[in-house]
Amino acid sequence: MATTVKVLAKELKRTAPDLLEQLKAAGIEKGSEDDSITEKDKTVLLEHLQKAHGSTDTGARKKITLIKRESSEIRQADSAGRTRTVQVEVRKKRVLVKAGDKAPEEVAAQPVKQVAPAAPAKPVISEEELEKRAAEATRQAELLARQEAEMKAAEEARQKEVTVPVVKEVAPVDKAPVAPAVAEKKLAADKAAKDLAASKEKELADIRARRAAAEAEALAIRDMMSAPARVLKAPSEVAAEEAKKGTLHKPAKAEGAEDKKKAATKVGGKTIKSSETSSTWQEEGTRKSGGLKTRGDTSGGVGGWRSGGGRKKQRQIAEANVDTNFQVPIEPVIRDVHVPETITVAELAHAMAVKSAEVIKLLMGMGQMVTINQVLDQDTAMIIVEEMGHKAHAAKLDDPDLDLGTEGHDAELLPRPPVVTVMGHVDHGKTSLLDKIRTAKVAIGEVGGITQHIGAYHVETPRGMITFLDTPGHEAFTAMRARGAKATDIVILVVAADDGVMPQTKEAIHHAIAGGVPLVVAINKIDKPEANSERVKAELVAEQVVLEEYGGDVPFIPVSAKTGEGIDALLENVLLQAEILELKAPKEAPAQGLVIEARLDKGKGPVATVLVQSGTLKRGDMLLAGSSFGRVRAMMDENGKPCNEAGPSIPVEIQGLSEVPAAGEAVQVMPDERKAREIALFRQGKFRDVKLAKQQAVKLENMMETIGEGAIEAKLLPLIIKADVQGSQEALSQLLMKLSIPEVKVQIVHAAVGGITETDVNLAVVSKAVIIGFNSRADAAARKLAENNGVDIRYHNIIYDAVDEVKLALSGMLIPGKKEEITGLVEIRQVFLVSKVGAIAGCLVVDGIVKRTSSVRLLRDNVVVWTGELDSLKRFKDDAKEVRAGVECGLSLKGYNDIKEGDQLEVFEVTEVARSL
């Protein structure tokens, strides 16, 4: 595909007219956006732009350097006659210069300047450190100057020793013959003086170079010492690598260099290394050997791979390293550990940079036996982190939910209808009041006359549209009422004028206050003769609901759901509260809402009642609700009529989710299925991990208590609950779990919405459970399977009946209670001792009746001495089954002979009594 002006402008992120102007300025004539551009045109344009911006480098290569390396081996014999192989590397370098530049010979003829290695970047240091370094450098300079002076004095003394004796030995001779000799000696002396001056100058230059090297080395060492402890690479390593690439830049080794390296000067009681001593201690052994090394350090030096002197030598080297190497003091590292909701022991140890054994040891000290793969909950993990001295932060790492809720913030906010929840005690007339407003007959269709679902309706009134949520009033539906208060803007509190404030009325008040929702009180049933509105007002004030007529802000409207009295005033007050709240929501945005209710329909699949809170929900949208997701296949309003979209504050029934969502879950429209699936799977895994971690924590906490108290095995009543909607299933499960006591417990094996299927029956067979169908029925296959396997299925449509039946079943599982009843009193008149039998008591039955099977207590001075059973009971010589009051008898006690005259026997019987919850 040919490149056009338009395509190039798009790649350069510029407009086509601007690019045409630049091409014209570069001398390239292009008439329109569709003209093609060649690579040559691009190069010309690039050079023009570089010149226009002041760049001298046109990007073209002017010089190419080719380096060729050749390696070979030569064999060389030493003085002992042994041959060794030396590797020789020859480097050939060729420079290719672009036409118009200097020739390679001219370039080669120029002297090569020695490029000084770049100084390592110095870290930022404080003024105190600068002063210390300056003092150290001054001291080093003084020591070197003193050393230089001493060497100079020694040289002068040596010169005097050489020259003075020669002068003394010369004999006096005649001037004429001596003149040529004197001239020669003078020339020789001048030459020697020049040589001496040159050598002194050379020595001084050498001393200066060594002093500079020593100062640089000292500065480098101090920089290394003051550098942070975790520096991985010394700054001087770059220069060292450059130095290793060639050998031409190294100076020739001077004579006596080894002596200079070993020499040290003592000044002030301190030993100072020679200035040529390198700070790289591992190369010291290599320098001492003086031989050619082709494979690194093989001389047995500190870093060598040959042992050199055996284990003793290695031990000495290791001890030398310990004594000379600088050890940075280690401080405890305090880490910020982000702890998610669940984390394994291994992950927690990795986050703290410790071994897993340390964490397991600490947990064992806290009474928890765990493995490295054990999942810990967030609270336990944070305690472990703090115990080990780190900082723990509760976090939700890698949570895709964090990306949600960012769409639609810039949309225009428009007024929306208020969402009004009707709350109150059971049978106070909430649904009847809504029926009167909607002119419908919902309450008549409710089983038992009570509401067991959340009903969502929107009503068109002359003053505007209102969305109503009708919540159950029975105590079992606390969670439903909490969800209703969460989704609402205004709460209508219905109180019966003849009944007053009841427990669920108080609970509704608490829900409204906790949610910060304004209240409107409707006193219902004012048409009844026993209605007492004043008593209701006083009870409401006692519950911190101050009415307007008492100086508060809560409207108070007497209404009658039967006659319709006060309905208009109630709606007017509701709309007035809505105007004060200024309720607004974006309409042209992805929908967000709340699951009010959910159920599993056999033909439609998962069905959810959703209240749209913002945006517009359309048919075909990808929806995410908790851990379930799916595309909206169908939408229906509260009357069962299909609809294509729903705006803010509109309740709709949707189909198409992957599973039944939990009631109260947030609903949001997602851009695509991939994102929705990712978040749903993440939530499923997180819910499972959190649940398992909490179960494990409870098991670990109760393990020692169970061992200490002794395991009391409770009887279990396994149940499988199938309900029509999520809210009813949730309420029934919670209510049945509350029936559990230590002796008998309710075990809910499975709870779900929908009809009873063969899967449920098979699960009941395995777990020996009873199936409770609440407003749901079993299909034909499930009924047949249940009959064949003896599975008990109970159907209920009123929550009271289900609870009562389970309570009765639990009562039947209780161990019967024992009741003791005193049936008679016997007085011992005489005691007979009979061999082989024991003591026989002659008695008189004072009160009641004595039976042969009765249990007795022996009383002595009204104190119980013994409790047991009768061994025999006789009347004269005959055995008797029972003896009544006023009759004498003889009896013996089983296993007890310590009977005395005057003792009494208390006769009693123990009977079993059925217990109930």
Swiss-Prot record:
The keyword NAD does not apply. GO terms for cellular component: cytosol. Residues 252-262 have a biased composition (Basic and acidic residues). Residues 424-431 are annotated as: G1. InterPro entries: DNA-bd_dom_put_sf (IPR009061), EF-G-like_DII (IPR053905), EFTu-like_2 (IPR004161), IF2_assoc_dom_bac (IPR013575), IF2_II (IPR044145), IF2_N (IPR006847), P-loop_NTPase (IPR027417), Small_GTP-bd (IPR005225). Residues 298-308 have a biased composition (Gly residues). Residues 241-312 are annotated as: Disordered. Residues 274-283 have a biased composition (Polar residues). GTP binds at residues 424-431, 470-474, 524-527. Residues 449-453 are annotated as: G2. Residues 560-562 are annotated as: G5. Residues 524-527 are annotated as: G4. NCBIfam families: IF-2, small_GTP. One of the essential components for the initiation of protein synthesis. Protects formylmethionyl-tRNA from spontaneous hydrolysis and promotes its binding to the 30S ribosomal subunits. Also involved in the hydrolysis of GTP during the formation of the 70S ribosomal complex. Residues 415-582 form the tr-type G domain. Belongs to the TRAFAC class translation factor GTPase superfamily. Classic translation factor GTPase family. IF-2 subfamily. Keywords: Cytoplasm, GTP-binding, Initiation factor, Nucleotide-binding, Protein biosynthesis. CDD domains: IF2_eIF5B, IF2_mtIF2_II, mtIF2_IVc. It is found in: Cytoplasm. Residues 470-473 are annotated as: G3. This is Translation initiation factor IF-2. GO terms for molecular function: GTP binding; GTPase activity; guanosine tetraphosphate binding; translation initiation factor activity.
